Amino acid sequence: MKALNKLKVPEWITAGLAFIYYWIMALYKLTNAPIWQDECMEYYCSIPVKGAIRGVTQYTTMYERMAYIQQQPPLYNWLMCIWLQIHDSEWWYRFSSVVMGFIAVIGLYLVIKKLCDRFTATLSVYVFSSIYILMYYVKEASEYILLIMLLIWTVYLYLFIVEKITVKRAVLFTILCVVDIYTHYGAVFVIVPMALQLLVYYWRSGEKKTFWTALVSYIIAGVGAGIPLLYFYMLPQSTNPISTLGADKPIEITGNNIILDFFDSLMWVLRWCMLDYDRDAEKITWTIWIILFALLGLGIFVYRKTHKKEVRAFIRCNIWVFLIYYVITTLNIYAYGWFGNRYNLFIFPLWFILIAVILYETVQIFKESDRQWMQKLTPFMSIGIVIAMLLYCTYGDYRISNHWAKSDLRTVVSTWRADDGEEVPTFVNFHQRYAFVYYLTHSKDYQESDWNQIYCNETLETLGYSNEEWIEFLEANVYPDGLPTQIYVVSGQHDTVVGALESIGYQTTAVVDTTAKLFLLEQK
């Protein structure tokens, strides 16, 4: 970093190039992967249509759809309701996340610059923009990138408060926390320990006025924003069979050893943030373990040696965030009791910032040490970190260029249309109906008569039906005049309804066989 400072490169150039890189990575193949189930669910919860939405839901208002088919607070849908009034297309819908991601990147740059320096901030933006799982959510129309964006700016305000306490900053922090929790329930794992930590900090610093103001603002926020969120959204959403708020299953502890389970959970979260579900992840899990313990060791080292109170406070905050998250998730209260998935994305911005700061502070501590051998190691450490980050960026860029299409209903609908599928009875299963309806109704050839032969299944319970139950369901609810000789089935796999029809003599042809399926079943 010392060599870079000597170059006297203007900040607008270094930062500008990093931001341009973000835009390149974010816009690259933005709509290459089709919009899938969750994005379409968000879409139909964000359009102010009155009345049932054919093939999607019988709920007649935007509020009912958010309260009974969603699993999140309403802020994202409110924003998308406005965004989609400007334009309604697949690209524009996804582009909203790119814009939020850019605001997140600006916040990240400012946070890292504040804690480290502008060159570390620049490198952080490059790395941030090359992480596959992050760019996946930048290219997905969902609340997750909004959550990341808001949490980064929450950290930025948190650092300003630790630097200098003011009543205005304390109140702004409370407001931002409310916005966070109205974006995603997982934000509570961050804002609760952070808010309590600041409350203690106000008291210990002798800022009694700020303490009481903050405490009152917390109470007002809890009553004025928390109770409505609980009553109008959390409680109705908890009745959803696929709700993430509570799981009816035994508590699982790895090896019946709580210590092992704790570190295993840490590893799963770190691995997911670094690699997502890479097919080679199992082969290099040992590498993740090494990285995990190296980071833990460096974190302890930095906490003991650094003179920056902001860094020490942020490390303590991260410890409390994960401890609370670990306990709640292990008890199956959150995220089905699983670690290492999108429901822990609230941890991503905190850990990213923490890792960047730990690496930077480690180099600075070695550089400022009285021991010559530590000073001599400093340039090699800096070069090693930069090379490691560039190699990681290369891996991330490779993953991003091979963006995975979760559920390719775009191909299913276009093939179905090309094969005159509207003339054949078509059964769309529960999890595929959102995206099927989206691509059907956004097709340039769409007309109301397309619905004449389509049945979209809105009954979740049918997923576990036996062959006999399926046939009974089809005959009673879908085809009361008798099963047709030809049926298209839109599914995500060779599922139970296909098996049931095959059991009574239908022969199956896989017309589309990708991450979504279009089966043609015919009686012979």
Positions of the model-derived regions?
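Membrane interface segments of multi-pass transport proteins and intramembrane proteases
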Residues: S369-R371
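Short, Lys/Arg-rich, polar N-terminal cytosolic tail immediately upstream
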Residues: M1-L7
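Membrane-proximal helix-loop-helix interfaces that form the catalytic/acceptor-binding platform
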Residues: P10-K367, L377-L521
